[in-house]
Amino acid sequence: GAKFTLFIPSNYHNKFPLSDHKDWIDWLKSKGYFELAAHGHYHMCERNDIGECEFFEIDTEDKAKSRIWQMMDEWSDVDHKPIGWRNPGWLAHPEAVKWLGPIFKYAAIHKEHNHNMEWACKTFYGHDGIHETDISFHDGNIMFQSHIAGDWNDNVWNKENYEQLKVSLAYLLKSYDIKFSTIAELL
């Protein structure tokens, strides 16, 4: 069956700290087909002009270290140390990347939005939404991505996107030798 890497903000919009939902994290970890990875702390910005690209506005060493500490502290409170990272909103400031890279074993990033930045960890490229029909291989891998909910993204889990992903997976399984894995299992 399929496996999933769930990129989870550690305190989404400053309303849902992981430490208040340890039972959910424990349940996800118990399943065996989820990898839990980091996806920012707040997944929101102080600026109004860059969407939710939280780590794009983190432009100093002090800001980067402080936000990373807040994020990893929440993860520690649920007894989990994520080894993977994805930028909220795909973008990150070079100063943030400098401090994120050594914390994680890998970063799952968008090739174009990364702007050729060097990471101090392994990088995996992939950005195909569950709703898309033009699927891309990156270094022999396919990485579907989605959002659980929200009306600002096309790649949310609704019936139409679920049906499209089923069609895409059926085609890929028929056409290629596919092995489902989490990103951590690719290391």
Model segments located where?
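Short amphipathic alpha-helices and their capping/turn segments at secondary-structure boundaries
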Residues: 18-32, 131-137, 168-172
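C-terminal domain-boundary segment and adjacent tail
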Residues: 4, 8, 105-111, 148-187
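Charged, low-complexity C-terminal accessory regions
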Residues: 121-151
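Non-transmembrane alpha-helical segments in soluble domains
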Residues: 25-26, 72, 97-101, 166-173
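Metal-dependent polysaccharide deacetylase catalytic core of the NodB/CE4 family, i.e.
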Residues: 2-94, 146-152
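Active-site glycine- and acidic-residue-rich loops that bind
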Residues: 14-17, 124-128, 153-162
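His/Asp/Glu-enriched short active-site or ligand-binding loop at hydrolase and phosphoryl-transfer sites
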Residues: 97-133, 180-182
